[in-house]
Amino acid sequence: MTQDSALLQAPEPMLRDGSNSRKVFIKTYGCQMNVYDSTRMSDALARDGYEPTEDMEEADLVLLNTCHIREKAAEKVYSALGRLREMKKKKAADGREMMIGVTGCVAQAEGEEILRRAPAVDVVIGPQTYHRLPEALRRAQQGQRVVDTEYAIEDKFEHLPIAESRKIRARGVTAFLTVQEGCDKFCTFCVVPYTRGSEVSRPVSQIVEEAEKLVEAGVREITLLGQNVNAWHGAGPRGEAWSLGDLLYRLAEIPGLARLRYTTSHPRDMDDRLIEAHRDLRALMPYLHLPVQSGSDRILKAMNRRHTAAEYLSLIERIRTVRPDIALSGDFITGFPGETDADFEDTLRLVEEVRYAQAFSFKYSTRPGTPGAELKDQVPEEIKAERLERLQALLLKQQQEFAESCIGKEIDLLLEKPGRMPGQLIGRSPWLQSVNVDAKASQIGDIIKVRITGTGTNSLFAERAEAAV
């Protein structure tokens, strides 16, 4: 459903009492990019007088920003919409209006089907068109039911406001910043190319402007996001071709920006410039999420990953050569169609060789519309589950060993939020671990030197080593 971009600048509607004050509740499912998208939607809706709330009961608008990556994702959304239908009906009986919107990747995949199965829904907006959300809501208020999932011609980021400094400050000292969307890799298990579209990179100037505004508002650490973030490309100040490494060098020049991270990467796009950035940039944290999915060349080929296990291991060796302290994270799928016991053992061997600081692992789930769904030799669920249990036990063991190896180390800790105990603050280590420290004289946003003293279930403990830096 195409629209004139001029509609995006429509005047703000007023409530019956003459005010613009309304409440929006946004439920975010899935990845970090959805978290980022939810904040941008919230900022766009602020122009129309919507204030965010964490209480769904008081919301005039409820948005479900959805994820389609796992099996039964759509059914979970329909289940939530059933509960919202009852809430909407109850509010209507009390003389209160509530609008319901579905955004994100389930919205993109399901489209009109959502309106058919969930008649209480007013608006369905895809991830490439959520800049049109305010206008879609205006139309819904006039009685229309809106579905907008066609890929926009216009650059959505040009139509999205960046939040005021006070709102950025309230969100904390770390922030996400999407620099790339979509994927052209077409891994046979993945829905991303179908829900997020082809790879698109934001221009350098737009990224730098947003990063500078985040830092001006007090953000100390920025994580660059993309479905395939290291496929980002753009033009430098003289029109020269830039890759993600070049962008990181540029962002590292921003005064006050202490830390940089990026996720999620594909092994095929880890070029020399990006590896050099890991070597040279103090601001680029020694942590890399680099999914491999399997250690079997036969399964990697069936997944259309376009690299071998040996090539992945060689890449890891190159990165560790320039940044010996780097911590590695990965993604794994057990039970991909045709996976044999021997294939799975190859995965375990790769994990043993890499030694991950943390990793994410899942059973293969059939995604309608993907090539993997059409493959023969689907693996029985009980075998998928047994392999996943074995893999997760190994990964957990490695995670615990990495955490224990940190004991006694002095590190720079970015303080992010208060802890549970008086005087306690929680920060993130360079390797993305949560760290608890007694830091009464420090403030959130400080980077202090601490010494790791112990490990918890999902965190580390530390004592202060010296004054803030």
Curated annotation (Swiss-Prot):
Stretches assigned to the TRAM domain: 404-466
Catalyses which reaction(s): N(6)-dimethylallyladenosine(37) in tRNA + (sulfur carrier)-SH + AH2 + 2 S-adenosyl-L-methionine = 2-methylsulfanyl-N(6)-dimethylallyladenosine(37) in tRNA + (sulfur carrier)-H + 5'-deoxyadenosine + L-methionine + A + S-adenosyl-L-homocysteine + 2 H(+)
UniProt cross-references to SUPFAM superfamilies, sorted A to Z: Radical SAM enzymes
Entry annotated with the keyword Methyltransferase: no
Domain MTTase N-terminal: 22-142
Compartments (UniProt record): Cytoplasm
Amino-acid positions noted as binding [4Fe-4S] cluster 1 in the UniProt annotation, renumbered to this chain: C31, C67, C105
Subunit structure: Monomer.
Annotated family: Belongs to the methylthiotransferase family. MiaB subfamily.
Record protein name field: tRNA-2-methylthio-N(6)-dimethylallyladenosine synthase
Natural source organism: Rhizobium etli (strain CIAT 652)
Lineage of source species: Bacteria, Pseudomonadati, Pseudomonadota, Alphaproteobacteria, Hyphomicrobiales
Encoding gene per record: miaB
